[in-house]
Design a protein with these regions (language model features):
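Solvent-exposed soluble domains appended to multi-pass membrane proteins
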Residues: 1-173
Length: 173
């Protein structure tokens, strides 16, 4: 009952928000997303007994959630497929034609070139299959991702030149 009530209330609030913001003159983008499935019971039993997922908590389907992006200035429907949580903002900015910071541009390139997601040792391939091992190309992108994150948080900008993204850094100035 609690889960169903939560779904009903979230749906009602989504309706109120979109109704309100559809009347606003300024551009608005709303992003609705949950970071995990509700286990409903212990060990995700309802998902495994229904055949939706395997009996392993590592099953990628148990870690995918629905994502909804809504805007009051675009009614284009897009199926995003599976993307990592860290790609939500870059994908949203690209879809709605917003200027992206360097880091988001890198994530967009990685999403198109290497994999749909790389989280906790599980790789979601571009074709939707999963793997636990990175290809050499994926390893290169993963290493560059780590290097860029480290450099942006603690470094002095060394990663920008190494990744061939100097022109993006100049555009951001």
């Amino acid at each position: 009952e609690d889960f169903a009530t939560g779904i009903r209330d979230a749906d009602a609030m989504l309706g109120k928000l979109t109704e309100y913001f559809s009347q606003v003159d300024e551009p608005v983008i709303l992003v609705f997303w949950g970071d995990h499935y509700n286990p409903i019971d212990s060990n995700y039993d309802i998902y495994t007994r229904s055949g939706y997922a395997s009996d392993s908590s590592a099953d990628p389907r148990l870690h995918q959630t629905t994502l909804l992006m809504w805007s009051n200035y675009s009614d284009r429907a897009v199926d995003l497929g599976t993307i990592a949580a860290y790609d939500i903002s870059p994908v949203m900015m690209e879809l709605f034609g917003l200027r992206q910071p360097l880091y988001f541009q890198f994530l967009g390139r990685q999403l198109r070139a290497a994999y749909r997601a790389n989280t906790r040792g599980t790789i979601m391939e571009k074709d939707g299959t999963t793997s636990n091992e990175l290809t050499p190309l994926q390893q290169k992108w993963s290493d560059e991702h780590w290097l860029l994150q480290y450099d942006l948080m603690f470094g002095k900008g060394y990663a920008l030149g190494r990744m061939g993204l100097e022109e993006l850094a100049e555009d951001a100035e």
